[in-house]
Amino acid sequence: MSSNTFTLGTKSVNRLGYGAMQLAGPGVFGPPRDRHVAITVLREALALGVNHIDTSDFYGPHVTNQIIREALYPYSDDLTIVTKIGARRGEDASWLPAFSPAELQKAVHDNLRNLGLDVLDVVNLRVMMGDGHGPAEGSIEASLTVLAEMQQQGLVKHIGLSNVTPTQVAEARKIAEIVCVQNEYNIAHRADDAMIDALAHDGIAYVPFFPLGDFTPLQSSTLSDVAASLGATPMQVALAWLLQRSPNILLIPGTSSVAHLRENMAAEKLHLSEEVLSTLDGISRE
């Protein structure tokens, strides 16, 4: 099995990290049902070895970053916090693009303030084109240039991308050094196979979201049968498959439950045989 660490920016991080999206209220909007539980989950994540947390100030909005600060500040030196800009929330909880220079600059400063930081470790430009639900072609030069300028000002250490096409990745790499790409990818949704391999060749991290499908979890009898045969959960198998898919894949499964967090972290110890991997590879063709 590949190494359990990978370099993100200038730090080595454990490949099984934590996504903070579910720490906000229902629909990633408003406060959590129990703030104490959210704080406990974050502290337990670090106790279990997590040193890569994915967040955004548009989760809540503001909520997850404020909880992260309350739970973990002052931050340990080995912790990498990755955030995203490029979207905002409407009063009705809708997800809206926020791509103007002023909106991008405000988002960086909102993240800094709510996390209690002077500089952000990694900022992903979250691209919302087309219907906003998946990557769509279109130039990101203007928006990325704004983010690169904030990097030059010392507000951002490293830059990443989210919800992008291969063409946009190539465009971005001509403007700034890109340390990670965050797209939807899982055992059933494998449109980025070629991108993952190309990024791995260049030492760039790939961070899949929705590891078991989007807000409607993947229903696969094959996955369920494999999980049962291994004495594992479908999510654990899906995470283990991703870890073995490529050494540059960093995982950020999210949860608001300590028990579920521990289940997710146990996936790191689950080794899938070549026979099992071959069976699971067939899910994308079902």
Residue ranges and their predicted role:
Residues 31-45, 99-115, 165-170:
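Short, acidic/polar
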Residues 78-91:
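A short, structured active-site edge motif that brings together acidic residues
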Residues 10, 47, 69-80, 113-116, ...:
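Acidic (Asp/Glu)-rich catalytic clusters
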Residues 22-36, 91-102, 131-136:
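Active-site mouth loops of central-metabolism enzymes
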